[in-house]
């Protein structure tokens, strides 16, 4: 009886909390950038094939492939001519039974030196540039992952994984948010093909925002007709990612792997290939050619959208745009270095980004092969 009463109380509190919250289509967008140059070079088509420490981001079920020794992954990228800086790091640790794997991941996206022009205009209407101060806006995510195999049937192996994530967002000294959420994933692996399913923000991820504004700043907001922010809660709706890959063994040394993913969102119409009020579907396609599992060449395409044609002077014609990506990688003993080259759109003025990542298998000297 006490347990039933506890669950009822918990549900009531959750419903009450959600009633004051707002679902946003593009909440926590920094968590959609990606992890590792391999995944970015394949246009983020990773949910089925990922099998290293970056699986904590793409699909935690893939962490089961990290065996015998811990694995470290690091990545750095800069966007918009260096204005935005994105860093990712993860550590995958096989547990003593060599079946379950623990993953720890950290993501950070930040923009520094943002001008704060709140006090630019003096009370008499004059402009005082010396009143401009700068601040930084930074988003952090901490992912705690656990994965293990759950079933073997014939030639297929099934593994599952979960993420618990803590989110911290900060805009100078003015605004701070804390949030948490959960992800869950499954991988089915065969000799030539794999299937992956990832439920992101499966229980709905929320951010609780609080604001710290001085009285002088509130006064400026009031007299300039700006809303004075108050505490609020922001919700991120669940997303389902499904995908599959197939390996073409071209000869003894050369393999070609192709993967297709579908991102399914349920928060209303989006600018995607399939768009409806019930579900929107965003496809991603990736390829990876590998030679002796030492040298890799990759490519992919994603982010299909309808946008105004840059060459149309009437500003009415729409065309399909997309985001291509290419990359390469090579392995040297227990170290893997990957590179990706992406652009944010294929219009006349694309914004290109170079991404590098490093993977190190922390093998003990006595275990080196």
Model-found features: residue ranges?
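Bacterial Sec-dependent N-terminal signal peptides
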Residues: 1-26, 287
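Subset of outer-membrane beta-barrel
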Residues: 22-369
């Amino acid at each position: 009886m006490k347990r039933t009463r506890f669950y009822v109380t918990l549900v009531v509190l959750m419903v009450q909390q959600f009633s004051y919250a707002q679902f946003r289509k593009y909440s926590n967008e920094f968590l959609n950038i990606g992890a590792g140059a391999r995944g970015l070079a394949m246009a983020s088509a990773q949910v089925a094939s990922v099998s290293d420490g970056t699986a904590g981001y793409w699909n935690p079920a893939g962490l089961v492939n990290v065996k015998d020794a811990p694995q470290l992954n690091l990545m750095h990228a800069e966007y918009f001519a260096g204005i935005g800086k994105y860093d990712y790091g993860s550590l995958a640790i096989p547990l003593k039974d060599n079946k379950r794997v623990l993953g720890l991941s950290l993501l950070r996206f930040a923009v520094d030196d943002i001008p704060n022009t709140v006090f630019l205009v003096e009370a008499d209407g004059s402009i005082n540039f010396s009143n401009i101060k700068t601040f930084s806006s930074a988003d952090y995510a901490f992912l705690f992952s656990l994965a293990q195999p759950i079933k073997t049937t014939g030639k297929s192996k099934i593994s599952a994984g979960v993420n618990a994530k803590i989110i911290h967002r900060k805009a100078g000294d003015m605004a701070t948010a804390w949030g948490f959420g959960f992800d869950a994933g499954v991988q089915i692996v065969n000799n030539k093909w794999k299937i992956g399913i990832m439920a992101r923000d499966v229980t709905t991820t929320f951010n609780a925002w609080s604001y710290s504004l001085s009285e002088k700043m509130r006064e400026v907001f009031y007299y300039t007709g700006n809303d004075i922010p108050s505490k609020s809660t922001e919700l991120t709706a669940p997303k389902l990612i499904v995908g599959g890959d197939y390996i073409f063994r071209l000869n003894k040394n050369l393999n070609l792997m192709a993967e297709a993913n579908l991102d399914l969102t349920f928060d209303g119409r989006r600018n995607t290939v399939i768009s409806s009020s019930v579900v929107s579907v965003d496809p991603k396609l990736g390829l990876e050619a590998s030679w002796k599992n030492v040298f890799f060449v990759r490519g992919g395409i994603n982010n299909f959208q309808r946008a105004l044609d840059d060459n149309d002077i009437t500003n009415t014609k729409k065309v399909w745009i997309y985001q291509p990506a290419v990359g390469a990688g090579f392995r040297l003993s227990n170290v893997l270095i990957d590179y990706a080259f992406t652009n944010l759109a294929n219009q006349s003025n694309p914004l290109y980004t170079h991404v590098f990542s490093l993977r190190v298998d922390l093998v003990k000297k006595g275990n080196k092969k």
